[in-house]
Regions:
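NTP-dependent small-molecule kinase module
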Residues: 1-19, 151-221
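Walker A (P-loop) ATP-phosphate-binding motif of ABC ATPase nucleotide-binding domains
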Residues: 25
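Hydrophobic anchor at the beta1->P-loop junction of P-loop NTPases
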Residues: 28
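P-loop (Walker A) phosphate-binding loop of NTP-binding proteins
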Residues: 31
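Conserved lysine of the Walker
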Residues: 36
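Hydrophobic positions on the alpha1 helix immediately C-terminal to the Walker A/P-loop
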Residues: 39
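ATP-dependent small-molecule kinase phosphotransfer cores
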Residues: 46-134
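A glycine- and Lys/Arg-enriched "phosphate-lid" helix/loop adjacent to the NTP-binding pocket
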Residues: 107-183
Length: 221
């Protein structure tokens, strides 16, 4: 698969050990249609922060090809993307705050929900190592998780009419899969996710996120 070779070559170009800069790193997570991308862009603008995303732009052209592959190959693509993003975060955080549109938590939550068959009770228990941040991956200062009710998510998705990944379609069609993703997010540790209700207006959600960031990252101006 030529796309896999290209991704691996990019990973090989990343330094083995990345040292982050002095500025804070904030990750914003959320299921599809929670307003995550819009909020992420607004937060980056308000903080005059660098805006990054996972998977990063340098491999995003191959995302569709990997989304059509079996789960194990798809997960490898997103996992490797996180390590490429970590290298970008390290460089950017030396110059300004960094806001990241998805990172390791989403990769892990979707992987766990996909690999664990059956209902939510079959998930690994809370505090299981699978919910722990990888020791070799650059860690953010704060992870914000945007949430809306299943009914509101469905209304927004159907109103957008945008192309979705197979996993996003699964979220809409399969409430058990969605619940497993949500519980996996809730059980992430070191760092855990700080939940923000994304149901109100965009401006109210933005202010709630900025308030949380300034509370948790006092080094911001």
């Amino acid at each position: 698969m030529p796309e896999a070779r290209a991704v691996l070559e990019l990973v090989d170009q990343c330094p083995r050990q990345v040292l982050r800069g002095a500025f804070p790193v904030i990750v914003i997570e959320g299921l599809d249609a929670t307003g995550k991308t819009t909020v992420t862009q607004a937060v980056a603008g308000a903080l005059q922060a660098a805006l990054l995303k996972s998977p990063p732009a340098c491999i995003s052209q191959w995302r569709q090809a990997f989304d059509d592959e079996p789960a194990i190959i798809r997960r490898a693509f997103y996992s490797l993307g996180n390590y490429i993003v970590a290298s970008e975060i390290a460089q950017a955080s030396a110059r300004s705050p960094v806001v990241v549109d998805r990172y390791w938590h989403s990769t892990a939550a979707y992987a766990i929900a996909t690999e664990v068959s059956g209902a939510v009770q079959h998930l690994p228990p809370a505090h299981h190592p699978v919910y722990q941040w990888p020791k070799d991956l650059l860690k953010p200062d704060l992870v914000v998780l945007l949430t809306v009710s299943p009914e509101e998510r469905l209304r927004r998705i159907r109103g957008r009419g945008l192309e979705r990944t197979s996993e996003e379609e699964e979220l809409e069609a399969n409430s058990v899969f969605r619940q497993k993703v949500e519980v996996s997010y809730a059980w992430m540790e070191s760092p855990g996710c700080h939940v923000v209700d994304a149901s109100p207006s965009r401006e109210r959600v933005l202010q709630a996120v900025l308030s949380l960031i300034r509370d948790r990252c006092p080094q911001l101006p």
